[in-house]
Design a protein with these regions (language model features):
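Short Cys/His-rich Zn2+-coordinating modules
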Residues: 1-4
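Polybasic, low-complexity association/targeting segments
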Residues: 6-58
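Short, compositionally biased low-complexity segments
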Residues: 7-18, 147-152, 235-244
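Conserved aromatic-histidine-acidic binding/catalytic patches
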Residues: 9, 25, 84, 88, ...
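Local cysteine-cluster metal-coordination motifs and their immediate loop/turn environment
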Residues: 10-26, 71-102, 115-122
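Gly/Pro-rich turn-and-neighbor structural signature
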Residues: 45, 49, 53-78
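Internal, well-ordered alpha/beta segment that forms a basic, Gly-enriched binding/recognition surface
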Residues: 89-180
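Hydrophobic, aromatic-lined core segments that form the binding pocket/scaffold
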Residues: 158-319
Length: 319
C-alpha cells in the first residue's frame, strides 16, 4: 500500500502537547487493549487516580469494550499533568494512536492529512519554506490497521467536464494536484457566515458550536484583514490541507462537494479568526491565527459529522 502526504506535513512527530489527552473526548477502547492496559496498571507503571478507568459505552461495536474514563476537568485518566506524554503510550487505544492523522483510503492508496487542532500539526503550517507538493511518504502508524474513510470499493467521482462520465484515477490525481497547487484563502467574503452556519449545522447533538460573533464582518475588516497577508504562506498551506484528501469526494457529490467543503473551511477559519481577535481585542498575530486554525479543525474534523458536512451543499441546492 502506498501512502501520500502533503510535504509540509511529513515532519510531523508528537511533541507531547497533551491536547489529545485533555479535550474530554469519548475514546473507545478495543477489547484487545483491555488486558494490555490492565497489565500495565498491575505493574504499577501507571499512577492511576480514577477508578474505574474503563466506563460503559452506549451500543458500542462488538470489538469495543468501553470508553476511557475522564476526570471532572475532561482530562483522560491516564494523563498526568506535568509529565511527558501518555501513561499508556505503548498500549493506548487506536483512537489515540491515529490522532491527529486523517486518512482517505481509495484505490490509489492512503492519502494522509492532519487535524490542525493538534498544536504541533498547526505549527507545521508556519514552518515550511518549500513549495507545496503531494509526496509519497511512510505509513502514519505502525502495522496494517489504518483508520479513516475507506473508499476502496467506491468508483471515482464524475468529471465536471464530461456529463455522466467517471474520472479515471489518473484524472482524479491530476485534479487533486491542481486543487492543491491553486489553493488559497482570501479575506472576508459576503457568504462567510452562511457557510459557517452550514458547518455548525453538521454538528450532531448533544454537541454544539457557538454562533459567529455578532460583529464578525466588522471584526474581520478592522482586526483580521490588516494582518491577513502577513500569513499568506501559512494560510495557503491550510487551504491546501483542506483541498487535499477530501472525504467529500466520496461522501458527497464528488468534485463539487470537495470544492464546497474547502470553501466552508475557508469561511470557518475567517470567522474563527474574527472571534479570536474580538476576544483578545488586538489585531491578528501568529498566536491568534494558530488558535483560529485549531478551533476551525476542532469544528470541521472533530465536531461536524463528515457525511452531513459533505452533503450540505447538495441539500441546499435542493431546498
Amino acid at each position: 500500500m502506498r501512502f501520500f502526504w502533503l510535504n509540509f506535513h511529513l515532519p510531523y512527530a508528537c511533541r507531547d502537547s497533551g491536547i489529545c489527552c485533555t479535550s474530554g473526548w469519548p475514546i473507545p477502547v478495543e477489547r484487545s487493549s483491555v488486558s494490555l492496559i490492565e497489565d500495565a496498571i498491575a505493574r504499577k507503571v501507571i499512577p492511576l487516580r480514577v477508578e474505574p478507568w474503563l466506563v460503559p459505552a452506549g451500543d458500542p461495536p462488538d470489538d469495543v469494550a468501553g470508553l476511557l474514563a475522564v476526570r471532572d476537568n475532561g482530562h483522560c485518566v491516564f494523563f498526568e499533568a506535568g509529565e511527558r506524554g501518555c501513561s499508556i503510550h505503548s498500549v493506548k487505544p487506536a483512537g489515540c494512536v491515529h490522532f491527529p492523522y486523517v486518512c482517505l483510503i481509495d484505490q490509489r492508496g492512503v492519502h494522509v492529512t492532519l487535524s490542525h487542532y493538534c498544536p504541533t500539526a498547526a505549527s507545521l503550517l508556519f514552518e515550511s519554506n518549500d513549495p507545496i507538493a503531494i509526496v509519497e511518504g511512510p505509513a502514519p502508524v505502525a502495522g496494517d490497521s489504518i483508520e479513516g474513510l475507506d473508499a476502496r470499493d467506491s468508483l471515482p467521482p464524475v468529471s465536471r467536464d464530461a456529463d455522466g462520465k467517471l474520472m479515471s484515477f489518473d484524472e482524479l490525481d491530476r485534479w487533486q494536484r491542481d486543487q492543491v497547487a491553486g489553493a488559497k484563502i482570501d479575506e472576508f467574503q459576503s457568504d462567510d457566515v452562511a457557510l459557517f452556519e452550514r458547518a455548525r449545522a453538521a454538528v450532531p447533538p448533544p454537541w454544539t458550536w457557538p454562533e459567529a460573533p455578532s460583529q464578525v464582518e466588522s471584526l474581520c475588516w478592522s482586526l483580521v484583514a490588516p494582518k491577513w497577508h502577513f500569513f499568506s504562506d501559512a494560510l495557503t498551506r491550510y487551504a491546501a490541507a483542506k483541498a487535499y484528501a477530501s472525504w467529500a469526494l466520496y461522501m458527497g457529490d464528488g468534485i463539487d462537494a470537495a470544492i464546497e467543503s474547502a470553501r466552508i473551511a475557508a469561511a470557518v477559519l475567517r470567522v474563527e479568526a474574527a472571534r479570536q481577535c474580538g476576544w483578545s481585542g488586538r489585531e491578528l498575530d501568529r498566536e491568534l491565527l494558530t488558535e483560529a486554525i485549531r478551533q476551525s479543525d476542532l469544528l470541521l474534523v472533530h465536531y461536524a459529522d463528515p457525511q452531513l458536512l459533505a452533503t450540505s451543499s447538495k441539500d441546499r441546492q435542493q431546498d
